Amino acid sequence: MLSLDEDYQAWEEYPQHRWVFNKLEVALKLGYKAGPACVPLPKTSNTLFKAIIRPIYNLYGMGISAKVKTFRPMIDNEFIINHGYISPGHFWCEYFEGTHYSIDYKRTDQPKGSLWAWEPFCTMVGEKEENNLTKFTKWVSVNPPKWNLPRFISEIDNVEFLNIECIDDKIFEIHLRTGNDVLHGKPVGSKAIPIWDDEQYNIKILEEQGYTFKGNHHPDSFKYNAHGLLSDLRIGYMIK
């Protein structure tokens, strides 16, 4: 089997599961309030609706083109149905607040559809600012949350690993590969602090605190700027 590091590889390897890359379809399967560009937002009792806007498909990852916005549906819907605020190829979804988990799962020998079909083996909690969804400041290895995956995820078969991202128990991304490799094999409590191109001064500071630098999976850092779509360039992590 191909060693999968990227979503585009998983797209080619698992054509039967390509629905997982459709983030709008995942949101609707999970019962979230969501819709593509041009679909009006639900009208709420408090007149405001906080949403995250993202590309329906983004096989590059890194939160490209994602942003949070609070709408006034009674006023803004007239613009939204004419492509105001939300560009073609994007969708809106209700915004969830809470702990950001990234969980790597491996397939067990339990049958397809079993509650125990997938076993978590590396869980990280990430920290970031709401006004910059691509620039994380810290990842910490933690024990996995105690919850059951939705049945439609348990029924994914012929795949070796999954990476699931969620806010508390609200899943928002599914990857047919691992995602937490930077802390694989590390004990609970281990930390990975991203080092960004404009913050390289932190390397020496963190080395004095016992951290060790680990470069990106791909040594060519330009591969992490999405051909200019990302303004923040990650060059690696400090691990402790």
What do these predicted regions represent?
Residues 1-5:
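N-terminal non-globular leader segments, chiefly Sec-dependent signal peptides
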Residues 62, 110-113, 124-132, 138-240:
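ATP-dependent carboxylate activation and anion-phosphoryl transfer catalytic cores
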